[in-house]
A protein has these predicted regions:
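Active-site and adjacent substrate-binding regions of carbohydrate-active enzymes
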Residues: 2-14, 18-22, 26, 36-38, ...
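Short glycine/proline-centered coil/turn motifs in the loop regions
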Residues: 29-31
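Short, solvent-exposed loop/linker segments at beta-strand-coil boundaries, enriched for Pro/Gly
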Residues: 45-47
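Short amphipathic
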Residues: 64-67
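Exposed beta-strand face motif in extracellular beta-rich ectodomains
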Residues: 73-77
Length: 605
């Protein structure tokens, strides 16, 4: 079927200015017949159509193009192919033989380009208390329960959030060589602010590093050491709430006329007297009706958002916790104002900073180009991947918005889910979003697949070849397990590596290296070429190269004739070997393969 996506092969300028002209291209297989084709786009809310013309043609395909003028900040468009007795639409969700809503139309946003460095980044998520413990003795706060390093975390108990294992930022610094050797070039930290919990999402200050982690001094040393290794650091900010131990709340409770009083929502019907996130007294909800709060958080010259992006503190960007709920409570909806305000503040002090938000569900309304650069792509990536390879029927679906255990789907359902969710956002937002297999809030992938190493490798291969910014939760690369978010926050056993899956670690290193070296995986589009129940294959195509990716979740016997796609195999890159024009995969277990392809046809026009 005809193909178009937002990558460089199909869109001449992904970040145009209003008034610029952009060339849109469609690749059409010779087997597909039509009389005429048009692009339909919206100018000032009104649909307009422009006919495509033949640009070039080869043995297996032809390329059709149209030049359009960008009239609005956001331009939605789709293509239609007309024949004698039919018409068919092509939008970001796929091909349709009937009229469909414009929610999944392709989109071009006329704003400056997103930070270029994120495309070639692979991030490593670190939960500071559980990654590495230095020899420096740190204070144990009164709220904490000290634990031995290699104990398992307690799950579902009152002490779960107060167990401290002793990981700190100095420990991270001491293991940066490991991080570098793994191949990642970014570290995403869950919060490092002072708090009354091990997860630190209940900040008692946003302007300093928790002394339990080594304080500001440890952070400065870590930033310097990371910079030498060309590793960027991503902070984690809770703009939705603070902790009950924050001085803002104490001042607000003492003085009803204080400016801090406006920072919160008040509720006399609950014992603690204020609205907490999900009713939790430990997490007072922030009220952005307060101009003073906005100044503190992001608008002011020395605001929290800006402080940590300064050269002194060295963060490369922010991950916004529960970004979808920030600025929202009942009838109050200041979400877009706050989101845009945070983005504006970041652009003022560090234009190349990355802004990515947590959003466990529908992300389209937040990723229109003007707020978050991207989101943690749970619904458009992690959830369909889990559903496709899940062997563990005991894992609940609550975190992913399901009132039942994770279901089982086939390959077609996986691809259609991905197209549905990812097709609702601009391509530039998709590639700026974080793709992940798990996190500190979920079960770990090794547990999802019931310890099946080959199946885990299938998931990891998909993670490191799919559009977006891959994020690996520390420990996944050595096969750490965990049946829930709380259980997944296990420590890294640095002293005894006999429990490490070293063979899997080697595979992950190789895949990360491939991801960072190959332009097709950095700048390429996404074209599905094989979709079966148990196996999938797709092309990542850029101006410089083409890579074919194959994965299976079990036994398969299939062939991919790349000559029908206009290619031949140039070299095998990873996993299954292949050459010539036909790649054969006959296996009784989960399998992976990557091949560099080269064109077998001459395009003329």
């Amino acid at each position: 079927m005809p193909h178009h996506d937002g990558s460089e092969l199909y869109v001449s300028d992904a970040a145009p200015k209003i008034g610029d002209k952009v060339v849109l291209r469609v690749r059409v297989p010779k087997s597909y017949t039509f009389a005429k084709s048009f692009v339909r786009l919206y100018h000032d809310g009104e649909p307009r159509s422009f006919e495509l013309t033949l640009e070039k043609s080869g043995a297996t395909e032809s390329w059709w193009a149209v030049k359009v003028k960008i009239e609005n900040l956001s331009t939605q468009y789709r293509f239609v192919f007309v024949d004698v007795d039919k018409y068919e639409w092509l939008n970001a969700a796929g091909f349709h033989d009937h009229d469909v809503h414009s929610n999944n139309d392709f989109q071009i946003v006329a704003i400056p380009a997103y930070p270029d460095w994120i495309r070639s980044s692979v991030f490593y998520q670190v939960f500071p208390d559980r990654f590495a413990k230095s020899s420096t003795k740190r204070p144990i706060p009164e709220w904490a329960q000290a634990r031995q390093w290699n104990e398992l975390p307690t799950v579902g108990s009152k002490v779960t959030g107060t167990e401290l294992f002793g990981g700190d930022l100095t420990g991270v610094e001491e293991h940066l060589d490991y991080v570098t050797d793994l191949g990642v070039n970014g570290i995403y930290f869950t919060p490092f602010f002072p708090a009354r919990s091990n997860h630190r999402y209940d900040a008692s200050s946003f302007t300093e590093v928790d002394p339990v982690l080594g304080g500001d001094k440890a952070m400065f040393k870590l930033v310097t050491a990371a910079k030498k290794r060309k590793i960027r650091l991503l902070g984690d900010l809770t703009s939705n709430h603070c902790g009950a131990g924050h001085p803002w709340l104490a001042k607000a409770q003492r003085n009803k006329k204080s400016k801090e009083r406006e920072y919160f929502y008040w509720d006399k019907s609950v014992k603690h007297g204020y609205v907490g996130w999900w009713g939790l007294a430990s997490l007072p909800k922030l009220n952005f009706h307060s101009k003073a709060l906005r100044k503190e958080m992001y608008e002011g010259k020395n605001s929290i958002v800006k402080q940590w992006l300064s050269p002194k503190y060295g963060m490369a960007g922010w991950r916004i916790d529960v970004g979808n709920m920030t600025g929202r409570l009942g009838a109050d909806d200041m979400h877009d104002e706050v989101m845009h305000g945070i983005r504006k503040a970041m652009d003022q002090v560090k234009p190349d900073a990355w802004l990515v938000a947590e959003n466990g569900d529908f992300i389209a309304s937040d990723l229109n180009g003007f707020g978050w650069h991207g989101a943690m792509n749970y619904q458009g990536f992690m959830r369909p991947v889990w559903n496709w390879i899940n062997l563990n029927t005991t894992i609940g679906g609550g975190f992913q918005g399901l009132p039942f255990s994770m279901p089982k789907i086939n390959g077609k359902q996986l691809v259609e889910s991905m197209k549905s969710f990812n097709g609702s956002i601009p391509w530039r937002s998709l590639v700026a979003s974080m793709v992940l297999l798990d996190s500190h809030d979920t079960a770990r992938m090794r547990t999802v697949v019931l310890g099946d190493k080959k199946l885990h490798l299938t998931a990891m291969t998909l993670l490191l070849t799919y559009p977006g910014v891959p994020s690996i939760f520390a420990g996944d690369e050595i096969g750490l397990e965990g049946s829930s978010g709380e259980d997944s926050r296990r420590t890294m056993n640095w002293e005894d590596q006999s429990s490490w899956d070293l063979a899997f670690l080697s595979e992950v290193k190789e895949l990360i290296s491939i991801r960072k070296k190959h332009d097709a995986l950095i700048n390429g589009g996404l074209r599905w070429v094989l979709v079966e129940d148990d196996c999938l294959a797709f092309l990542r195509e850029s101006k410089k190269e083409t890579i074919l990716v194959f994965i299976s979740r079990g036994a398969v016997n299939t062939k991919i004739d790349v000559s029908k796609l206009g290619y031949i195999v140039k070299k095998s890159l990873y996993g299954v070997l292949g050459d010539g024009s036909i790649i054969s995969v006959n296996t009784d277990k989960p399998t992976q393969g990557l091949w560099v392809l080269e064109s077998s046809q001459k395009l003329s026009g």
